[in-house]
């Protein structure tokens, strides 16, 4: 039987390495955060600015290319079939789902005006969905597990929603900062709180997606590494004990796949809700700001 002798932790090139020393040899324990490492393929630097082409850039391009090719082959002239195949059914399912989501979550507008938001919502949903799903493929990279990527996406959408709010309502868009019925002495404090709350929408949109994807992938990686370490111990008792973590990893794959789909759905719903708030000002203020 392999006996535990020593567990060492090394820091090399800003990476942590765990080594388990047994009588039969050394078993490396992979770090669960190693899968999120950014690797520059084409380093580019201008002054203090870095424009390197990295693995997140590669997988984002692959995801975007896959989405565009899939939609192109289905929607091009003669591309659709009377009896749809699996890929055509997938595109049609998403194409039917997004307009229903827009109609349900964005109110107070005509159907034609609502459909102006359809391209943005459709591209955002499909991009997030395919980014999350391709992260489930072994040895791939989960783009949405990096905070700066999700934060950049959420802030871009947040700025666009704010511009839409000003385009439709002018300066009266600022009336959401002061709900009706608020005592005048409390108005400055409430305006500040509402402004902070509004700005935190962009943070919450990015943090929610990043945290869920990173936590789920880290958990699967930890259990997978534990199962692999037990398999490397060359002992029947450890092999039998490895079946538990192995079955847990297989069982977690299904919920993690559900999380990948649901997070794209939740993020899209949040964007639609923010668009609804920007286009339909349900809150009125005591002092109206006219155009």
Swiss-Prot record:
The protein's matches in InterPro entries, at most eight in alphabetical order, are given as: ATP_synth_F0_asu (IPR000568), ATP_synth_F0_asu_AS (IPR023011), ATP_synth_F0_asu_bact/mt (IPR045083), F0_ATP_A_sf (IPR035908)
Query: Record keywords: Transmembrane helix included?
Result: yes
Identify its membrane topology class.
Answer: Multi-pass membrane protein
One cellular component term (GO) for this entry is: mitochondrial inner membrane
Recall the GO molecular function terms of this protein's record.
proton-transporting ATP synthase activity, rotational mechanism
Localization in the cell: Mitochondrion inner membrane
Q: Please, which domain of life does this record's source organism belong to?
A: Eukaryota
What is stated as this protein's family in its record? Answer: Belongs to the ATPase A chain family.
This protein's assembly is summarised as: F-type ATPases have 2 components, CF(1) - the catalytic core - and CF(0) - the membrane proton channel. CF(1) has five subunits: alpha(3), beta(3), gamma(1), delta(1), epsilon(1). CF(0) has three main subunits: a, b and c.
> What is the official name of this protein in its record?
ATP synthase subunit a
- The record lists the organism as Vicia faba (Broad bean)
The protein's gene is named ATP6
